[in-house]
Amino acid sequence: PVVFAAKSCNIPVIIHESDMTPGLANKLELPKASRVCCNFPETKDMFPEGKAVVTGTPIRKELFNGNAVDAINCGFTDNKPVILIVGGSSGSAVINKAIRENIDKLLERFNVIHLCGKGNLDHSLDNKSGYVQYEYIKKELSSMLALADLVISRAGANAICELLALRKPNILIPLSAAASRGDQILNAESFKKSGYSYVIKEEELSSETLFAAIDDVYNNKQTYIETMEKSNLTDSTSIIIGMIEELVNNK
């Protein structure tokens, strides 16, 4: 309704498509929109020529201000590299199971911070050295991201754009098509194609595929970082503000 009202009042409209394929709301709003902001190069070609701009997603400023020292209160007592597992706000049963089944082997080489989702704590692991688990965190996330050497995550658009902006080597495990419209799969494949991420399909997640992915990303982390550094999608807020100012000035 806001978009249609704005258009009827001759007010320019900018919409943002986070996922690689347009959702229903943006499809309906497209005829009324002056510009469409996109996260993925592939998305731009799905809109009329000249309508879409690859801007990326505005990133919360606090994520850039994380301090690894502040996250040391996780209780780690050695200098092992850190893996941060992020299963989304509600967690991921599939990822939680894979991590916990392999936790002893993981802890031989890494310290592990596991964000497992509400109600998903496993108290049998509470005293395991090098492993900390939380249902969910908010203000501490920036510091934990600063501490992490490698991130294992779902492939929601905002989450992966944050990993790109922070230059964090990552393994993406997108929601399966059976549990979603497939947008995370396409998001992940775009990042894989660009060289930003290693992708494991949810249905292919196993001990073997998990450790193969960890070995690849950790052993080649500098290559992943350098590839992400070539992306210009780190200052999306300024790009979008510039677009707004242009439309207002040319109204």
Model region roles, listed by residue range:
Residues L233-K251:
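C-terminal alpha-helical cap of glycosyltransferases
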Residues A68-D70, F76-V151, I185-A188, K193, ...:
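Donor-nucleotide binding loops and adjacent catalytic segments primarily
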Residues I11-P12, D149-L150, R167-L175, Y196:
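Structural loop-to-beta junction motif characteristic of Rossmann-like glycosyltransferase folds
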Residues P31-K32, S143-L147, A165:
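Alpha-helix C-terminal capping/helix-to-coil transition sites in glycosyltransferase folds
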Residues Q222-T234:
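A short, well-ordered alpha-helix in the C-terminal region of glycosyltransferases
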Residues Y134, A146-C161, K168-P169:
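Acidic donor-binding loop of glycosyltransferase active sites
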Residues K7-A68:
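Active-site-proximal region of nucleotide-activated glycan assembly enzymes
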Residues F4, S142, I160-K168, E189:
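Short alpha-helical segment that forms part of, or immediately flanks, the ligand-binding pocket
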